Curated annotation (Swiss-Prot):
A GO CC term attached to the entry: ribonuclease H2 complex
CDD domains noted in UniProt: RNase_HII_bacteria_HII_like
The protein, known as: Ribonuclease HII
Cofactor(s) named in the record: Mn(2+); Mg(2+)
Length: 255
């Protein structure tokens, strides 16, 4: 083993795919500190990859169960933007191919903006179909946020280029003639729902960044329409915009 240079050990470790590989045992016996560091790095990376694969397996349980029942085009549906004081509620619907594997995809609230953008790109590239539904503030005020979120989800499903034969929906039942399951906290339990949530959130965040150009004083590019201190101070100083939800407190007090 000592006949191998540290560079050679590093290159060889990059080829190792399984923890049962005898080369790892050789590395353990190598007295060189640099080799031990390389081994430790490999073990950490492998453990992380293993955990991500286990997470993926757990989060495809609903999809595998639906597939066993004979369903092939399974769409995950979720929304973003129920709580903000301004902006639309946006829904995403995604059909992922059975062979698709996007490791690390999970509840969008646990992912950084950078990671969400990365997953958004992968989903749009690898998905069999992606649909988006948008319901704006005036409709939210007219029919209430719950119904608006449901309407956005229906729009997202109808926007899919492939017609799904089964739906996995985050905590809601949709008025569609398609078999479906409502999954509580679905974006943490189903990869399809997590994909829908990612599409919804990134789409909405981008919309709010565009609105910020029209209404720069509210900080929409940062707060996404939520009631931050900056947003509330601007609301008090300038009043509500056309994208504010007039039935939401405290917006209604400035109307």
């Amino acid at each position: 083993m000592n006949t191998l240079t540290v560079k050679s050990v590093k290159e060889r470790l990059q080829e190792v795919r399984d923890e049962s590989d005898p080369f790892l045992a050789q590395c353990e016996k190598d007295p060189r500190k640099s080799v031990q560091t390389l081994l430790e790095q490999w073990l950490k990376k492998h453990a992380k990859e293993k955990a991500l694969k286990e997470q993926w397996l757990n989060m495809t349980a609903y999809e595998r169960l639906s597939s066993k029942k004979g369903f092939r085009l399974i769409a995950g549906v979720d929304e973003a933007g129920r709580g903000p004081l301004a902006g639309p509620v946006v829904a995403g619907a995604v059909i992922l191919p059975a062979e698709c594997e996007i490791l690390g995809l999970t509840d969008s609230k646990k992912l950084s903006e950078k990671k969400l953008e990365e997953y958004y790109s992968r989903i749009t590239e690898e998905a069999a179909a992606v649909g988006v539904g948008i319901v704006h503030a005036d409709v939210i005020d007219r029919i209430n946020i719950y119904e608006a979120a449901r309407l956005a989800m229906v729009k997202a499903v109808n926007a899919l280029t492939e017609t799904p034969d089964y739906l996995l929906v985050d905590a809601m039942t949709l008025p569609l003639d398609i078999p479906q399951s409502s999954v509580i906290k679905g974006d943490a339990k189903s990869v399809s729902i997590a994909a829908g949530a990612c599409i919804a959130k990134v789409t909405r965040d981008r919309l709010m960044a565009e609105y910020a150009k029209t209404y720069p004083m509210y900080g929409f590019e940062k707060n996404k329409g939520y009631g931050t201190k900056e947003h509330l101070e601007a609301l008090q100083a300038y009043g509500p915009t056309t994208i504010h939800r007039k039935t939401f407190a405290p917006v209604q007090s400035y109307c």
